[in-house]
A protein has these predicted regions:
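A short, N-terminal "cap"/entry segment at the start of jelly-roll beta-barrel domains
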Residues: 1-37, 84-89, 144-158
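Conserved short histidine dyad/triad with adjacent acidic residue
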Residues: 40-59
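His/acidic/aromatic-lined binding-pocket segments of jelly-roll/cupin-type domains
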Residues: 40-41, 60-65, 96, 106-107
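Short beta-strand His + acidic residue motifs that chelate non-heme Fe in jelly-roll/DSBH
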Residues: 51, 72-74, 96-98, 104-109, ...
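Glycine- and acidic-residue-biased ligand/ion/polar-headgroup-sensing regions
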Residues: 58-78
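Short acidic-glycine-tyrosine-enriched beta hairpin
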Residues: 62, 76-104
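Double-stranded beta-helix
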Residues: 80-81, 105-158
Length: 158
């Protein structure tokens, strides 16, 4: 039995805080070839997850809030936000499923946020994700501007 408890969430959150990318995965699947990828994803505010989609092969992806507050954002082909959901288990907003071929990303809105993520496998880094050409590359100086634009949109809508 794999146990997901406060100790595990604290452990992965602490690793995310120390990571240059401000996030950390904890995989439950044993092999990249597993047909169901399951993981914890600890994300700190300021971490940039470049918008991407999963197609060829198509993959569904679901996110569930275990701790903290996280925004899951969907975009159209031009980079306009089409929909978003704030995941916050304390407000009974637990999760979302993102359809294959859908541009999406996520942003942490609170320190020590952790999601449980489930995605169709297998994982092959060469074809797992298609990154959006309209979004800055990870590590670029424009990623903060992009994050701020999304946060501004979300806060304006609330």
């Amino acid at each position: 039995m794999i146990k997901i408890d406060k100790h595990l969430l604290d452990e992965i959150s602490n690793k995310a805080k120390k990571s240059p990318r401000k996030r950390m995965n904890y995989n439950f699947h044993k092999e990249d070839s597993d047909t169901l990828q399951r993981m914890l994803n600890a994300i700190e505010p300021g971490s940039y997850i470049r918008p991407h989609k999963h197609e060829n092969p198509d993959k569904r992806e679901a996110f569930f809030a275990l701790r903290g507050i996280i925004a899951i954002i969907e975009y159209d082909n031009e980079g306009n936000i089409t929909e978003y959901k704030i995941l916050d288990s304390k407000k009974e907003s637990y999760g979302v499923e993102v359809a294959p071929r859908t541009w999406h990303s996520m942003i942490s809105l609170q320190s020590s946020s952790v999601t449980y993520e489930v995605k169709d496998g297998p994982y092959n880094p060469s074809d797992d994700k298609i990154f959006a050409s309209w979004a800055p590359e990870e590590g670029s100086k424009n990623e903060k501007v992009f994050i701020d634009k999304i946060l501004s949109f979300i806060h304006k809508e609330e």
